[in-house]
Amino acid sequence: MPSPRLPSVPRVHALRDFEPLARKRLPRQLYSYIHNGADDERSLAGNRSAFDDYSLVPRMLTGVSGRSQAIELFGQTYASPFGISPVGLGAMYAYRGDLVLTGQARAAGIPAVLSGSSLIPMETVAQAAPGTWFQAYMPGDPA
C-alpha cells in the first residue's frame, strides 16, 4: 500500500513570504484584520520603516560552536531575543490558535503574549503554557 503523500510545504525564506500564503488561506476579513494597521496605518508604516534600518550581517569563516541566541529578560532566560506578540482573535485563524501559538513558543523557549481579545480564557492558556504573558488593557484615569 503506498504511503499517503504529504502536502507540499511552500518555500518561506522571509516574513514577507507568508503574506501571499495567508491571503490564499484566510477569509478576506481575517486576512485584512491581521495584515492591515489601525486607522491610517501610520504606526504600521513607522514600524516597517524602523526595521528597514536593520539587517543581518553574515560573518564568514568564524567559529560557531560557542554561539547562543539566549537572552535574559525580567529574570527569565529565553532561547532567542524575539517572541510571539499578541494576536487578537487568534482562535479565528486556527482552531484554538492562541493555545497553538503559546504552546509552540513555550516549546521553543521564547516568550509569548496572550492578547487581551483572545477567545481562549487566559486561565486555560496559563495552564497549558505557563509563563505566557498577558496583554492587559487597564482602564484610563477618569480624573
Residue positions per predicted region:
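Short, charged beta->alpha transition segments
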Residues: S65-G75, V113-T124
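Active-site-adjacent beta->alpha loops and helix N-cap segments on the catalytic face
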Residues: A94-D98, L114-P130, M138-A143
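Glycine-rich phosphate/pyrophosphate-binding beta-alpha loops
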Residues: P86-M92
